[in-house]
Amino acid sequence: GDKNQITFTGRVQHLQDGSVRYDWTGVYMQTRFTGSRIAAVLSDEGTSYHNVFVDGKWIKKIKVSGKDQQTITLADKLAKGTHTLRLQKCTEGEYGCTTVKELIVDKNATLTAVKPKARFIEVIGDSYTCGFGTESNNRTDPFKLETENCNQAYGCLVANYFDADYALVAHSGQGITRHYGDSVRVVKFGQSVELCG
């Protein structure tokens, strides 16, 4: 799809073949579509988890793993009419970088980009922003990718409260001037840098 069909918010890389690649936590893609189903052709350079929202409601969390393209059904058996999809990367870029190749909808269905909101918030943070352990049942659990979910952390909660679009610039253990437990005052993010939204 093109910018008239799909909206990306956050730091992403637009590739020459039309695919879009991203690794930062919290990056999200939105589109309004007609029809009863929508699927995505995705791949990942590691492993990433994504939240799927349809018409503003959380539907499920999906896992994208491996460089081979996979077609993942995001929603199906929807009522007739126009629906809004939001696919949000909810885990950190250190563990996976996702590529969206295409969206698949019903025959004769349409895709329309979602207009940006009036407000935009950029949150710079660390593991609190990334949602480290937000889906864990025990606060002393070690890091697990499957229990990290930025959508349940303060940055996304504040943005949702104020009905704002957002971008998260966050990495567990990395600070603006110093990393956690590190005396070196240099920060280097090895992730994508193009900001969309």
Predicted regions and their residues:
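Conserved SGNH/GDSL esterase-like catalytic core that processes O-acyl groups on lipids
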Residues: 26, 93-95, 134, 139-197
